[in-house]
Swiss-Prot record:
Cofactor: FMN
Biological process according to GO: electron transport chain
Upper lineage: Bacteria, Bacillati, Bacillota, Clostridia, Eubacteriales
Protein name from the UniProt record: Na(+)-translocating ferredoxin:NAD(+) oxidoreductase complex subunit G
EC number: 7.2.1.2
Membrane topology of this protein: Single-pass membrane protein
Matching InterPro entries: FMN-bd, Ion_transpt_RnfG/RsxG
NCBIfam families with a match to the protein in the record: rnfG (TIGR01947)
Keywords, in A-Z order: Cell membrane, Electron transport, Flavoprotein, FMN, Membrane, NAD, Phosphoprotein, Translocase, Transmembrane, Transmembrane helix, Transport
SMART domains linked: FMN_bind (SM00900)
Entry function: Part of a membrane-bound complex that couples electron transfer with translocation of ions across the membrane. Couples electron transfer from reduced ferredoxin to NAD(+) with electrogenic movement of Na(+) out of the cell. Involved in caffeate respiration.
């Protein structure tokens, strides 16, 4: 009758392999942490530059932008009766040679056809919309994504003294109407809703 040979475990080898794996994992973790540390500042700087460019696009006359403190943004959201205060993301005061020339307001997420839509709106100190841009959108390409470019341009020059209304078909000249994107009324209303929030913020700041 054959006897089974006992298997001897060399604990020194096991410990050595475990130590090697630990060292490899530690080195990889340190390398990842170092990479994140090195790139974090660059990424943050790029985000700041991107947002500054976007503000200048919607409020061209501004040379400098001053952020309204978060606590004041929360107060504004409360004063204008926002059901979801968190949708008022940021408010900036645009200045040129020390004088206030207008405001930029970022709102979102308003509900579009396929998800959230964030809108940045520029409004001059005398109450005229100077431009809008869509900062973030999950809309379906070719449908909701049409809410850009030429369509955005119809907001420019509209009065910020009253809220805008989305209509199907041709708009009346000099009115507060916004022509809906064909086949994408939901997205049109989502973007316009964001702009209307910005109008309310402007009216609060200009009292």
């Amino acid at each position: 009758m054959e006897t089974k040979e006992k298997v001897q475990i060399d604990w020194k080898v096991v410990f050595k392999l475990g130590l090697i794996l630990f060292v490899i994992s530690a080195v990889a973790a340190c390398a990842l942490a170092l990479t994140n540390y090195v790139t974090a500042g660059t990424i943050e700087e790029m985000n700041v530059q991107t947002n500054t460019v976007a503000r200048q696009e919607v409020l061209p006359k501004a040379a400098d932008f001053e952020a309204v403190p978060a606590k004041d943004v929360e107060k504004i959201a409360s004063e204008i009766g926002m059901e979801k205060p968190e949708e008022l993301l940021e408010v900036y005061i645009g200045k040129s040679n020390g004088e206030v020339v207008g405001y930029t307001v970022k709102t979102g997420p308003t509900s579009g056809y396929a998800g959230e839509v964030q809108v940045l709106t520029g409004i001059s100190a005398d109450g005229v919309i100077t431009g809008i841009t869509i900062i973030k959108s999950n809309e379906t390409p070719g449908l909701g994504a049409k809410a850009s470019g030429v369509w955005n341009d119809q907001f420019t020059g509209k009065s910020a003294k009253e809220e805008l209304v989305v209509v199907k078909g041709t708009t009346k000249e000099g009115s507060n109407e916004i022509q809906a994107i064909t086949g994408s009324t939901i997205t049109s209303k989502a973007v316009t809703s964001g702009v209307n929030m910005s109008i309310q913020v402007y009216q609060n700041l200009s009292k």
